[in-house]
């Protein structure tokens, strides 16, 4: 089964990625992806796009040839306080805000620091999805993080790229996160973390973990465009109202 939604992609605007929006649209059409988010790295990363890149995402059309586009960011969690590198009214102009740890911005420290930073980001109300929380370079108190995510309505990502090209050794942590999410009622989403369009919608490894713990697939945000759009609307993203009529025939 091809899940029709991908929340985590990078374009050539992040210079260690290799595809354009046009490339992603073409692959989405081929694979049956109905909605994807463009989420380039936040400005604190060395090769990230300029701040204006995110401001000007408003020029992107809502839908091209039947494929919807969400305007987003993968922000960086910068410190123990859980602050991210995108702020103010600009956040409200985006459809979706991802955030996670990246070594060039927040070097690995210790379990207590990572846990506090992640929970503070969750509590901030600014972040919709925590990216690659299973990264073994950043050990966390999984139960504490998942509990906070469930309480504050923030989704946790099972990152497919973590099992293929980055963050080697993530399997055990991701399995524990998925299991805790099932037990504590937290929302999960699979992210391809594509840095080239060919991997858009690639969830095989992430899905194997979801299935191994028997996480309810009717709670996965990837299950339909409306499932994700409803989630984002509930989190205060008024801008997604523009997209909802385009998926009016969709079952959440």
UniProtKB/Swiss-Prot annotation:
Keyword NADP: no
Cofactor(s) named in the record: Zn(2+)
Gene Ontology annotations of biological process type: bacterial-type flagellum-dependent swarming motility
Annotated residues for binding of Zn(2+) 1: 8, 10, 74, 193
Gene3D superfamilies assigned: Metal-dependent hydrolases (3.20.20.140)
Cofactor binding: number and manner: Binds 3 Zn(2+) ions per subunit.
EC number: 3.1.3.-
Coiled coil: none
UniProt-annotated binding residues for Zn(2+) 3: 74, 102, 132
Hydrolase listed as a keyword: yes
Membership in a protein family: Belongs to the PHP family.
PANTHER family, sorted: PHOSPHATASE YCDX-RELATED
Protein name listed in UniProt: Probable phosphatase Shewmr7_2686
Organism: Shewanella sp. (strain MR-7)
